């Protein structure tokens, strides 16, 4: 996160256990489509803004080395405790590094990450980390990713996108305008899968439903593709 206010709100949500965004199971699109990447066992997968996602357990079980980054020490602590793992801990620059088996989590601010902190990265797994950020920060998030991750690493990007007003179904099921605006200059964008759902327009009960699109993108750097 880039502002102290955003950081404070995120840390406060974990202190207050306001974490409805945390999923209690592995993302079904991950389990369904990951094998199509043909990524070699032992490859290193970066999971930005990882929270305490169970997807990291799944990835490690498939034989991958997982490197997460998470601002909240409560989230990191809970991840290891709830999965009955006893991590080793040490300082790494501005971060606290927690490690157990194939899973490493850097506890600290994503925007403080340097390439040397991550080491070699073969794939990025973004499970709605991008879309969880405030809109004015997303471009900074993408730009920083390009600095700390090598061009050779593809991005497995999961998003939840609201259908825009006056948008046709064919437009809604295509590459989102924001995704195109953020990535098209430097990446080839492959929209691999789309699922539509109707969800409450707000957290207030008895609200109208709105259509949202759950999308899976595979992003490949143009510098590698060429």
Residue map of PLM features:
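Class I (Rossmann-like) S-adenosyl-L-methionine-dependent methyltransferase catalytic domain
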Residues: 2-41, 52-55, 68-103, 107-117, ...
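Class I SAM-dependent methyltransferase "Motif I" SAM/SAH-binding loop
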Residues: 46-51, 129
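Short beta->alpha connector loops
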Residues: 50-52, 135-136
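Gly/Ala-rich phosphate-binding loop of Rossmann-like dinucleotide-binding domains
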Residues: 60-61
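Conserved acetyl-CoA-binding loop of GNAT-fold acetyltransferases
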Residues: 64
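A short SAM/SAH-binding and catalytic strip from SAM-dependent methyltransferases
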Residues: 110-113, 121-137
